[in-house]
Amino acid sequence: NTEISLRTFSPEIVPELQRENALTTEYSKLIASAQIPFEGQVYTVSQLTPLKQDPDDARRAAAWKAEGEWYMQNADKLDSIYDELVKLRDTMGKKLGHKNYIPLGYDRMGRNCYGQEDVERFRAAVVKHIVPLADQVYRRQAERLGKAYPMGYADNALEFRSGNARPCGGPEDILAAGRKFYHELSPETAEFIDVMYDNELLDVLSRKGKAGGGYCTSLGDYHVPFIFANFNGTSGDVEVVTHEAGHAFANYMGRDIVPASCQWPSMESCEVHSMSMEFFAWPWAESFFGGDARKFRYTHLAGALTFIPYGTMVDHFQHIAYEHPELTPAERNAEWARLSAIYMPWMKLEAAQPFYGEGRAWQRQRHIYESPFYYIDYCLAQTVSLEFWAMIQSDPKAAWETYMKYTRPAGTMTFKELIANAGLVSPFGEDALREIASAAG
């Protein structure tokens, strides 16, 4: 890992790195500063999310339209930021001796056991095994909603006519349910969650002007993790307590590993910790969702499956962008629209919603701007987490033991080594995706 990290830097690219940092900060500030007028009030992107899931068709569509209009008003700025980022990164790659940015991008992600050809094989398996299954999910959703298939973004966002699963209670109730879950899951998780809560190592309430997104990091001097997020009253709030805390738990388990650079494994390895923890929380879904627990479980599993094509498309789009840095913004949007037909045939790109209709939806995905090539890590990890889901259904105790085998080595092993150490099926190739499609179908 140190060798890979050393390959990513040269004094020659310092000006580009500085400009890259300025541009990604500009993007983050632009999204965080969003003031979206809706029904006489003003919302941030995060605060608008529950309204984009409203069971009322007209209100939900209007919320999506309001968000899309804000993005369209800032389209030129979003285009210019990304256009400059692509060209900057291409320059960095070439200065470091590469044909384009892609090899440098992989090195910056710390990829130590797989490359572009592995990702291309994974992509092909996703299209073959997961896209048809995800398509069935959305066809059934259209039938439930009484909508024509394919549906637009606003209708795809509503899983049930009665509304999507919502947490019961407010932030304090969700955090209390989280403590209960971790206390009952295992002695290790009980100790971990008490450290997090008792030392206020979470900042999760949404505020105007607060940066968007959610993440977990570590406070190295104190040997503890820290969670940042924005609660918004949706099931995403529970994901903070499961997903981000899954990252935090893994970091807590590896906090004393020396050298400190081995306390975190590579990115895709980390995402297995978080996505799998979401599935370990299933038996406690009633604590989080009350009467909506069954609805949540269905939505969670369906969402895990349908995410894989979307995330793979995000990665494919970035490969095209960096293989062809000369593309204009309009040509990039056309590529997104083309890929949508392959990976997301259930998504209708509506002309009445130009932000989505023109193929601009990728501009909502901050990783594309801030963390190139990160997104495939989510897809690989989701594949492994679905292996855990299948195990949890038959033997939760054995599943947890397998999870701890995967987690304990932290960054002392590569992703492929962690998979083998835990006795899991590698997500590369067709076997894992084929088996998941069979189990979930």
Question: Model-flagged regions — what are they?
Answer:
Residues 144, 161-222, 234-235:
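Auxiliary, metal-adjacent structural segments of Zn-dependent hydrolase domains
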Residues 229-253, 271-274, 279, 317, ...:
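Active-site recognition of the HExxH zinc-binding catalytic motif
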Residues 197-214, 223-227, 345-369:
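Flexible, glycine/threonine-enriched loop-and-boundary segments that flank and lead into catalytic domains
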Residues 3, 241, 249, 276, ...:
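C-terminal, non-catalytic "cap/extension" segments appended to globular domains
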Residues 82-94, 98-99, 137-141, 246-256, ...:
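Long, well-ordered alpha-helical segments
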Residues 127-129, 254, 265-292, 300-302, ...:
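Post-HExxH zinc-binding segment in Zn-dependent metallohydrolases
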Residues 1-164:
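A well-structured
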Residues 144-177, 285, 301, 305-307, ...:
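Long, K/E/R/D-enriched contiguous segments that form extended
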